């Protein structure tokens, strides 16, 4: 056995030895885990307590939120003057419809959709810039 063959064999044996050292079993019930178990259990108990507190607060606040929303809606309806044009007034809706670009009148050359394209690009007849 020459020196050229001895070096690769020694390296191979060293590699196999190191590889087998890493293949040993590592059971989960070691001493390190047993010392951490009470701390983990305490954290879990605190988390459960906190979740139950938050759920109790949530169930207590839900009826209050619903009652507050109903009373605010009722007060807003009572506070709205009857003679002033509101957002649901029919006259207000008609005026809003005249101003909206969807209901622009035809330009005479194109239909409604092309008039809308023409107003953006400058194409078409009688293009009026309303914006």
Swiss-Prot record:
Tell me the tissue specificity.
Answer: Heart atrium.
Keyword Transferase set for record: no
Its Gene Ontology cellular component terms are: cytoplasm; extracellular space; protein-containing complex
Q: Kindly give the Pfam families that the UniProt entry links to this protein.
A: ANP
Name the GO terms of the biological process aspect: blood vessel diameter maintenance; cGMP biosynthetic process; cGMP-mediated signaling; negative regulation of systemic arterial blood pressure; neuropeptide signaling pathway; protein folding; receptor guanylyl cyclase signaling pathway
PTMs? The precursor molecule is proteolytically cleaved by the endoproteases FURIN or CORIN at Arg-99 to produce the active brain natriuretic peptide 32 and the inactive NT-proBNP. CORIN also cleaves the precursor molecule at additional residues including Arg-96 and possibly Lys-102. Undergoes further proteolytic cleavage by unknown proteases to give rise to Brain natriuretic peptide 26.
Question: Which cysteine pairs are covalently linked by disulfides here?
Answer: 109-125
Q: Where does this protein reside within or beyond the cell?
A: Secreted
* InterPro entries assigned: Natr_peptide, Natr_peptide_CS, Natriuretic_peptide, Natriuretic_peptide_brain
Question: Which residues does the UniProt site feature Cleavage point to?
Answer: 96-97, 99-103
A GO molecular-function descriptor: hormone receptor binding
Q: What is this protein called?
A: Natriuretic peptides B
What organism is recorded for this protein? Answer: Sus scrofa
Organism ancestry: Eukaryota, Metazoa, Chordata, Craniata, Vertebrata
Gene field? NPPB
């Amino acid at each position: 056995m020459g020196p050229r063959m001895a070096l690769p064999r020694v390296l191979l044996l060293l590699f196999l030895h190191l590889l087998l050292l890493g293949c040993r079993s590592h059971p989960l019930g070691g001493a390190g885990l047993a010392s951490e178990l009470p701390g983990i259990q305490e954290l879990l108990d605190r988390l459960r307590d906190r979740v139950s507190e938050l759920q109790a607060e949530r169930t207590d606040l839900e009826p209050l939120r619903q009652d507050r929303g109903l009373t605010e809606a009722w007060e807003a309806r009572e506070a709205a003057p009857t003679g002033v044009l509101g957002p649901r007034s029919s006259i207000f809706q008609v005026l809003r419809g005249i101003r909206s670009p969807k209901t622009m009148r035809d330009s005479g050359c194109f239909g409604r959709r092309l008039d809308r394209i023409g107003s953006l690009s400058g194409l078409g007849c009688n293009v009026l810039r309303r914006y």
